[in-house]
Amino acid sequence: MEKLFAVCTPGLEPFAAQELSQLGLMDCDPSARLKIFSTESGASYESVDYEPGGIEFQGSLHDAYRANLYLRTASRVLVRLGQFYAAEFPELRRKTSRLPWENYLAPERSIALRVTCQTSRLYHETAVAERVAGAIGDRLGKPPAVHKYQEDLGADLPQLIVVRLVDNLCTISIDSSGALLHRRGYRLATAKAPLRETLASAMVMASGWNKISPLLDPFCGSGTIPVEAALMAGRVPAGYCRRFAFMDWPHFDSTFWDALLADAGKAIVSEIPKIIGSDRDAGAIRAAQANAERAGVAGSIEFSGRAISAIDPPSGPGWVVTNPPYGKRVSQTKDLRNLYAQFGNVMRAKCRGWHVTMICDRVQLIRNTGLDFDQGIPTMNGGLKVRLVRSLVKTPLTS
């Protein structure tokens, strides 16, 4: 068994834990990891404490394959190669050279090193990286080519190795994912301020959508939320159409991987509930349609160009999951306040009894909707601190 670590955006740890539990990779009850209470009684979220930025779990390398294929809310899956104390450079190099690098690196494979040092005697990150690279060369008999890690290199990404030194305790991990897991392979067309697929999936999960009732995104942009919802409802794995770093490892089990993909393909369903995406930006709608086409779900989503005031929800109740404009996306604060007030008015007029989930960077804007949102979950989007919040649009009492 290996120690594995699912990296995720801070705030999304409970969702990653829930997914791992559903995959049988964590021996826990998902409801104990993320408890979402009814908004009618004052919604709140409770989660156990996690290491910020990820979930550690145990499994085989085959389990690492599965995690990469299925996880929707994680950014990477790391394999822990070793953990040891090192207070001197010779000690660091000696102990690093004992790790089984030959299982993960072909002799010609280039590497990239990501090093962080905190409260340790070895504090110079560049020097630590040099010793680790040297130790890999000691083990393999040939020093690896070391390159800078750049996500936009695509298939030419070097093998990423992550080194952390905290209080002289060194943890060395190797990345099994390659490109970040939010890169599903379908979003080539983008609109302004695109939403990462991992956060979009977390929003759909947090909403409590039952995958039976309709789902609407009235600020859909390039379509990430509708596409992720369609993939989720259709049981299409998040990584079904992409490559991973582990495919280049010397002992990659292609037979197991092919069987895993075949089983995943058999589980895909074509009949999914009504999903609607709308946006006033015609260019965004064109991008959304192109992305849905590449994801193979264009026939399952209805996109239309219309302002929030003109939305036409299907008979419900259903779910609204959306990422309205905020932060740097709109320069005029007054315009934002008016937009959020209008959003709330439209929800009360057209979506009574519907569940609403959204993210926003300012509590005051959330209040401007006039909807009874919960306190939500703090997380990040595009470098901004945001809150993922939920509400239920109440139906007026009849006398």
Language model regions located:
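Conserved S-adenosyl-L-methionine
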Residues: 195-313, 329, 333-335
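A short, flexible beta-alpha/helix-coil linker loop
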Residues: 118-120, 179-180, 325-329
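Non-catalytic nucleic-acid substrate-recognition regions in nucleic-acid-modifying enzymes
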Residues: 1-159, 399
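Residue-level signal for inorganic ion chemistry
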Residues: 20, 113, 163, 323, ...
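SAM-dependent Rossmann-like transferase core, predominantly class I methyltransferases
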Residues: 172-206
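C-terminal catalytic and target-recognition region of SAM-dependent MTase-like enzymes
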Residues: 304-310, 314-399
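C-terminal edge-of-domain segments
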Residues: 161-173, 389
